[in-house]
Amino acid sequence: MMSPPMTTTLMFILNYAIISFHGQPSGISWGNHIETAEAAAILAMANRELRSRELLLWTSGSTHLLLQPILPLPLCLPFPLVPASIFKKMMLPLSAFSFWM
């Protein structure tokens, strides 16, 4: 079964994750901490939207999630990076996503 196409929102989320990347990749596991409640809510929505096994999301604290692509990032993200500041300006309040939780 094919995954739905990536939406603009999901592309911003994943680009933000790359920009926020810290630590060393281990094999095909890449960890990115998203440390705001708003980003966590958007990531949760995007994970349901994507509906594939390309991304695993789980909580690693009360206010952030760990984004862990299974595939190497170049295969997961075949589009240009955008500045994190642009993504942050586009983020909606956490309450906007509460009905998805």
From Swiss-Prot:
Annotated membrane topology is: Single-pass membrane protein
Q: Which residues cross the membrane?
A: 67-87
**Signal peptide span per the entry?**
1-23
Q: Which segment of this protein is annotated as the motif RxLR?
A: 48-51
A GO-annotated cellular component: host cell nucleus
Keyword terms of this UniProt record: Host cytoplasm, Host nucleus, Membrane, Secreted, Signal, Transmembrane, Transmembrane helix, Virulence
Can you say where in the cell this protein is located? Secreted; Host cytoplasm; Host nucleus; Membrane
Factors inducing expression: Expression is up-regulated at the earlier infection stages.
- What job does this protein perform? Effector that acts as a broad suppressor of cell death to interrupt plant immunity. Inhibits cell death induced by cell death-inducing proteins, including the PAMP elicitor INF1 from P.infestans.
Tell me the domain comment. Has a conserved RxLR motif that acts to carry the protein into the host cell cytoplasm. Lacks the 'so-called' EER motif, which is found closely behind the RxLR motif in most of RxLR effector family members, but the presence of an EER motif is not always essential for the translocation of every RxLR effector into host cells, or for inducing a hypersensitive response.
Q: What family does this chain come from, according to its entry? A: Belongs to the RxLR effector family.
Name of the protein in its database record: Secreted RxLR effector protein 64
